[in-house]
Design a protein with these regions (language model features):
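Active-site mouth loops of central-metabolism enzymes
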Residues: 8-14, 32-38, 58-59, 88-90, ...
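Glycine-rich, proline-tolerant flexible connector loops at the mouths of alpha/beta enzymes
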Residues: 1-18, 180-190, 246-257
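Domain-level signature for soluble enzymes in the chorismate/prephenate branch of the shikimate pathway
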Residues: 211-308
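Catalytic beta/alpha-barrel core
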Residues: 15, 31-40, 44, 53-67, ...
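Alpha-helix-loop-beta-strand connector modules within alpha/beta enzyme cores
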Residues: 11-36, 71-81, 131-146, 192-211, ...
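Short, acidic/polar
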Residues: 39-46, 159-164
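Catalytic alpha/beta core domains of metabolic enzymes, predominantly
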Residues: 67-198, 207, 213-216
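Structural recognition of alpha->loop->beta junctions
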Residues: 47-61, 102-110, 166-173, 276-278
Length: 308
């Protein structure tokens, strides 16, 4: 990017407007499309004046509705494609809201970039992929093309290939990979940069699988999954009925709704199913956290009946 919003001051924040002239040379001498990140209305005006073909909104900017609205207003009446990175925090509604602001301003050529989400204490990835969030975005915004930024997700060049393949396996429409002729000398994000030769190798190893699964074999499996899901829903409804009955007993006996010891024992009991690797322990915890949260909500409703 010509401009680079950084987490802390003092880091390289881009060359600025001067770099637009470099992009103009690339476009005129090599015939390539050029793009840059924009974070303010001034950036938009300068980029458009320089003939930049595509703009993108960075993660930190997406997280600020005021900044997105300012950019949307600056783009009103302009036919230029705009890509929007997910916000740094895992909030699908905030991401969708950025698209709504742009669309309402008349920007119709829109695309999404998944670059991962900040997570306190994250060690392996620079930004946790949390694939379920871009999947939910696509479920709700199916017409929006989505590309993946494995460089920012991984934060390490050795993760770019595997993350790129995961994105393609999830039917992403493309990739945004950072490359540098000499990554050691890169002024920012040097650890995640790959050389052009390395990029060529990565691209040669990627496999694009067919998204067409409309055949009899898949229909059979999906019918089986539907039957299992129906049973799961029936059991969840029964479980919540029992939770409400427990709430009534707790109300009668003056007991607190949340019982930490009981919850911890439940988690311990079911994580034993994870030992053979057939299901991830974090997935089990996540499932039971969601079920327990709804059980607590149901019990609180019973305990507080008549107190609203």
């Amino acid at each position: 990017g010509v401009w680079k919003p950084r987490t802390r001051p003092g880091c390289f924040e881009g060359v600025g407007q001067e770099a637009l002239r470099w992009l103009q040379r690339v476009k005129s001498e090599l015939g390539m499309y050029v793009s840059t990140e924009v974070a303010t209305a001034v950036h938009v005006e300068q980029a458009l004046a320089a003939g930049i073909d595509l703009l993108w909104i960075g993660a930190r900017t997406t997280a600020n509705p005021f900044a997105v609205q300012e950019i949307a207003d600056a783009l009103r009446g302009v036919d230029v494609p705009v890509l929007v990175k997910n916000p740094v925090n895992p909030d699908v509604d905030l991401w969708i809201g950025a698209f709504e602001r742009l669309y309402n301003a008349g920007v119709k050529r829109l695309g999404a970039i998944h670059r991962g989400f900040s997570a306190y204490g994250e060690k392996f990835y620079r930004n946790a992929p949390q694939w379920q969030l871009p999947i939910e975005f696509r479920r709700r915004m199916g017409d929006i093309a989505m590309i993946c930024d494995p460089s920012h997700i991984g934060g390490k060049r050795e993760l770019v290939l595997s993350l790129s393949q995961q994105a393609l396996d999830l039917n992403f429409d493309g990739l945004m990979i950072e490359t540098h002729c000499n990554p050691v000398c890169a002024l920012s994000d040097a650890r995640q940069q790959v050389t052009p030769d390395e990029l060529e190798i990565i691209m040669s190893k990627l496999v694009r699988r067919s998204a067409d699964s409309a055949n009899a074999d898949f229909r059979s499996y999906r019918n089986s999954l539907d039957e299992i899901d129906d049973k799961l829903m029936e059991l969840l409804v029964k479980r919540m009925a029992v939770a409400r009955e427990i709430g009534a007993v707790k109300r009668e006996k003056g007991l607190t709704v949340f019982q930490p010891f009981r919850y911890n024992k439940t988690i311990e009991r079911y994580t034993k199913y994870c030992k053979d690797g057939k299901i991830d322990i974090e997935a089990v915890k996540s499932i039971f956290e969601a079920v327990h949260s709804e059980s607590i909500r149901q019990q609180l409703r019973v305990v507080n009946e008549g107190n609203e």
